[in-house]
Amino acid sequence: MNISDIRGLSDTEIKKKLEDSHKELFELRLKLSTRQLVNHRELPRVKNDIARILTVMRERELQIR
């Protein structure tokens, strides 16, 4: 997910996306611990998505953009 895609979402959609990403990260960590995770590249991707979402939320809080 690109940061420009996130900026195009409303605040409620962003919060929902953040919640979904946290759930996905939890599930991926669970699969990793049970050795069921096939694509290890998914973990950093989800973490980066969460960071992007939090960045946009902070920008809106500070009214930077």
Swiss-Prot record:
InterPro entries in UniProt: Ribosomal_protein_uL29 (IPR050063), Ribosomal_uL29 (IPR001854), Ribosomal_uL29_sf (IPR036049)
Provenance organism: Dehalococcoides mccartyi (strain ATCC BAA-2100 / JCM 16839 / KCTC 5957 / BAV1)
Membrane-crossing residue ranges in chain numbering: none
Gene3D superfamilies linked to this entry: 1.10.287.310
One GO MF term attached to the UniProt entry: structural constituent of ribosome
Protein name (Swiss-Prot/TrEMBL): Large ribosomal subunit protein uL29
This protein's GO CC annotations: cytosolic large ribosomal subunit
Pfam families linked to this entry: Ribosomal_L29 (PF00831)
Gene name of this polypeptide: rpmC
Family: Belongs to the universal ribosomal protein uL29 family.
SUPFAM superfamilies: Ribosomal protein L29 (L29p)
UniProt record, GO biological process: translation
PANTHER family with a match to the protein in the record: 60S RIBOSOMAL PROTEIN L35/50S RIBOSOMAL PROTEIN L29, LARGE RIBOSOMAL SUBUNIT PROTEIN UL29C
HAMAP family to which the protein is assigned, alphabetical: Ribosomal_uL29 (MF_00374)
Keyword set, alphabetical order: Ribonucleoprotein, Ribosomal protein
